[in-house]
């Protein structure tokens, strides 16, 4: 029997949630591949991708879950929140309804996620300034009220996309992992569970391929 080699030191499950059409899939595509697709079809159910970061000679594997925003997929997508220790909750700055629905998404995540987690509130499509329906101040106030980080991004022109993901992971690393041992129950499609032990972490230094800023509520 051949044993599989674990190709990472730490595993971090992050979900990207929010209404349909706010740009979740393009945010992930821009972060992972620096690509943007005009007219990209809405996600059906859940899509999955990974990204590995090298920090202090440790490999950090991110599981990035892109969840559908349509109501009919709720029963499917909520099951994938289990074990998540991070979330990007996304709204469209040019769509008031997507902002009004943030409470719903936040509640669903907190009911299903790991007991310790970090959340980044993302006001996407900042390139649509002339059509803005949600002010930057409103986004900041919502984030502060619910103890989240906040940033405005544009998947179209890539503004702040990498910063949004990296600041979230930075917050998780320093606030949840640093000098603390915790076991993460990673649920893989509801079939296989693996326990990843995280502990005794030192302050991180990303290699030259990645930029990390200390977590802040106002980062744009």
Curated annotation (Swiss-Prot):
Disruption phenotype: Mutants exhibit normal growth and development, and endocytosis and the structure of membrane-bound organelles is unaffected.
Presence of keyword Protein transport: yes
Lipid sites, type S-geranylgeranyl cysteine: 219-220
Domain of life where this protein originates: Eukaryota
Keyword S-adenosyl-L-methionine: no
Any single Pfam family the record assigns to this protein: Ras
Protein name: Ras-related protein Rab-11B
Organism per entry: Dictyostelium discoideum
């Amino acid at each position: 029997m051949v044993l599989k080699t674990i190709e990472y030191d730490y595993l971090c499950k992050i979900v990207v949630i929010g209404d349909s059409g706010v740009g979740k899939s393009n945010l992930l595509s821009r972060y992972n591949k620096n690509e943007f697709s005009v007219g990209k079809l809405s996600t059906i159910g859940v899509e999955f991708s990974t990204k590995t970061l090298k920090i202090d000679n440790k490999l950090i594997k991110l599981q990035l879950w892109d969840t559908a925003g349509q109501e009919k997929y709720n029963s499917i997508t909520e099951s994938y929140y289990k074990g998540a220790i991070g979330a990007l909750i996304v709204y469209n700055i040019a769509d008031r309804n997507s902002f009004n629905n943030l409470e719903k998404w936040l509640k669903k995540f907190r009911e299903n996620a790991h007991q310790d987690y970090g959340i980044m509130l993302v006001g996407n499509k900042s390139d649509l300034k002339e059509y803005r329906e949600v002010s930057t101040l409103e986004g900041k106030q919502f984030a502060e009220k619910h103890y989240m980080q906040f940033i405005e991004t544009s998947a179209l022109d890539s503004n702040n996309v990498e910063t949004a993901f990296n600041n979230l992971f930075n917050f998780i690393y320093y606030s949840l992992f640093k000098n603390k041992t915790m076991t993460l129950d990673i649920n893989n499609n509801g079939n296989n569970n693996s326990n990843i032990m995280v502990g005794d972490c030192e302050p991180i230094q990303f290699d030259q391929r990645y930029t990390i800023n200390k977590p802040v509520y106002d980062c744009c």
